[in-house]
């Protein structure tokens, strides 16, 4: 099995807001993410794990559409996506209504859940933030459902 893992991409951030280079830096972050997707297309990992803060704030509908278009370029890779403490799910979040490509598994809840992948004999556990901060140690009580499988 091969997987890629990224976190804290912070798409949509405006580094050094007000400076002449701010917009270019913001675009550089999007370009870097698109380049990472191209690497995934070349390397064909089984999984792309995105463990929070793909966005710097609540994603706009057009931003999610752009990301979905990028994910659709790697249909051979299962994308597992969690919302983090910057892009946490709110009542009006477009995360809740996004129509993800078939290869995307989004963790919609703030309680640990899992996705099973029989072809890879793998189970992936995760959760999304629904608040800026989670104070409980939610993973402390999580134990693999099946120890004969690969559990991530």
Write out the residue ranges for each language-model feature.
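N-terminal active-site segment of His-dependent metallophosphoesterases
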Residues: 1-66
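His/Asp/Glu-rich metal-coordinating catalytic cores
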Residues: 47, 57-152
């Amino acid at each position: 099995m091969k997987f890629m893992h990224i976190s804290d991409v912070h798409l949509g951030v405006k580094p050094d807001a007000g400076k002449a280079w701010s917009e270019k830096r913001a675009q550089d972050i999007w370009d870097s993410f698109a380049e990472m997707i191209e690497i995934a297309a070349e390397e064909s990992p089984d999984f792309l794990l995105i463990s929070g803060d793909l966005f710097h704030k609540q994603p706009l509908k057009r931003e999610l559409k752009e990301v979905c278009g990028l994910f659709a370029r790697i249909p051979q890779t299962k994308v597992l996506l969690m919302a983090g403490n910057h892009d946490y799910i709110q009542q009006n979040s477009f995360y809740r209504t996004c129509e993800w490509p078939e290869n995307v598994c989004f963790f919609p809840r703030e309680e640990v859940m899992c996705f099973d992948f029989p072809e890879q004999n793998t189970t992936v556990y995760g959760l999304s933030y629904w608040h800026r901060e989670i104070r409980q140690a939610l993973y402390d009580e999580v134990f693999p459902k099946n120890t004969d499988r690969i559990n991530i």
